[in-house]
Amino acid sequence: MPSLQTRSPFTPDQIAQFQSQGYFILENLLTAAQISAIIERFDPLFDTQFETGIYPDEWYGRPGLSQLNATRQMTGMWRCDRTLAGYSLSGEIAHRNAALMGWDGGRYGLDICWIKPPNAPEVTFHRNNTYVTAIDPPNLITCWIALSHCTAATGTLEIVPGSHHWNCSDQVRFLHAPQEDYRTPLWQAATEAGMATPEILPLELPPGNAVFLHGNLWHGSNRNTSETQTRRSLALSTLPAHAKFQPLGTGAGYIFNRYRRFGSLDIDESFYPILWQHDGYRTPFLADYCSDALAVIGG
């Protein structure tokens, strides 16, 4: 019998659905207690109270500096907070991500929280792979986890099923509060791909449910029209374990590029650790740095 380390966390039909549609919804990935543990770490981080003393890679929506309805986003939280690192660096999530992509291992790519207060503006439609073209191969998969009731009214994630198959281009752009229609990049891509009427699917997700997104799937989010509800989510992205850097000057990825090693295209595991691998390997320092919040007991 295969061990928990090698056994696929998905059925062949589930993997086939993901490969066909570019997404897969998993119910009850997180418990209510786990969700509370995650959310209670957000306010200290946005108040620049970093447990490890290390700043995140990127953040938007700072108290006292940004508009009250600004979408708050933070990237690289695992470097700041070990509680959140238990989720961002989870081998269980990396295993699930890698299984859907057909990889034999996965390493940390990005960990991002999205917090949309009432009347928060739209997030422009985009493809995640567009932002990792400094990596070879420029492919990632994202586990997007609802931490609150994500509905059309609260500006939930919107996806276009099957759009990861489109033959179209995309470009790096600022995603927050677009001046034009937030769907404009999608319409342009659909026209280029010969898709007359792309289907936009708003995902209704209760807290704890997750959707796995192919890196080429078009997605964005509408305005939070609720007067009282804040929409929260956690997006955990995985790169293939064998990934390297593209030659310097190739592709986009300003966050990734700051962690390059001089004279090498290898990705340093100190900054982008391997979280799960088919042969059981996991970057050694993780055992001392944080617990795996979703570790499965047994073998």
Which residues does each predicted region cover?
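Phosphate/oxyanion-binding loops and surfaces in catalytic or ligand/nucleic-acid-binding neighborhoods
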Residues: 45-48, 103, 150, 166, ...
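Short, structured patches in soluble enzyme cores that scaffold and shape functional sites
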Residues: 112, 127-129, 145-149, 161
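Short, surface-exposed loop/helix-turn segments at secondary-structure junctions
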Residues: 126-128, 185-197, 228-231, 249-257
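A short beta-loop-beta micro-motif enriched in histidine and acidic residues
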Residues: 128-140, 198-199, 205, 229-230
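Short, conserved beta-strand element in jelly-roll/cupin
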Residues: 134-152, 204-205, 212, 236-241
